[in-house]
Amino acid sequence: LLGNLTPAIVVVVILYIPALVLATISIVRKRMLSAAFIRRERKRAFVVFGVSLLSLAGAYVQDPGYELKSDLYPLNVCYNVGLAFQRTALTQNYHHTSKDFTFHAQATHPEEKQEVYVMVVGETSRALNWQLYGYERETNPLLVQQSGLVAFPKVLTESNTTHKSVPMLLSDVTACSYDSIYHRKGIITAFKEAGFRTAFFSNQRFNHSFIDFFGREADTFDFIKEDSLDFSYNPSDNELLKLVEQELAKGAKKQFIVLHTYGSHFNYRERYPSGDAFFTPDYPVEAERKFRDNLVNAYDNSVRY
């Protein structure tokens, strides 16, 4: 997929590199602009500035929510850089700011009743490609046969990025209250307070942020990609099931297990064994229009698997 960035990179290099080189040469040789050039360009600058002010006024009229700090370049760049530094500092201080947080959670079911809850956090699984939600292909053949299954067809994510959406799934934080995440803990802590033995198993690497923080709240946690020194190690999500079996074998009366899968991230063909390809052909899968059908087949195979 990143190969499609090449044309954009080439254009940027052609536009900016020669200009930067010429500017550097002019500075080194101390070339001076003529007075006539300065007067002419100054007039043009005032015209551009006037047009910019009118455009800015138009933006405020059309969109009452328009903000200079977030919508006007390069002010938004400066704002976002500052915001990144601020959030990095808050993240690094998370363990201190959240240490006294509690849900005050209590179990309401009898202690002798065995309860096992498994929460699966998937990724990049498009609802429109789920048989369960009306997709014409058999991408969920086992789920549709499951009795007592409740599906929610009209659900929207609160973020389109993993580093925000997953922490919100693992806690009671919402998009509107996201800044409170620095002072709160996750659902695993709530279950621990209620007397459950907890486990968190992930098929992703550390991200040094809230997914790690919430996962490490569990009595047992394992980020299986970190178990190998080989950075190219790319296990299938079904490897997590082995850890689930081991956890269930411990025989605790109350268990809460969270699985964070790698889901259907590209390259799709790496998400399932070649022998389990149901929709074919699923190769080649380069991100090109002529391979669209192959890409869809491979993606649907990843959802099905």
Regions found by a protein language model. Give the residues of each.
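A broad, structural surface signal
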Residues: 19-22, 189, 242, 304
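Short intrinsically disordered, low-complexity coil segments enriched in acidic
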Residues: 1-10, 279, 299-305
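Transmembrane and membrane-interface helices of multi-pass
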Residues: 1-75
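A long, amphipathic alpha-helix that forms part
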Residues: 242-246, 283-305
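Active-site-proximal alpha/beta segments of enzymes that process anionic O-linked groups
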Residues: 52-119, 124-286
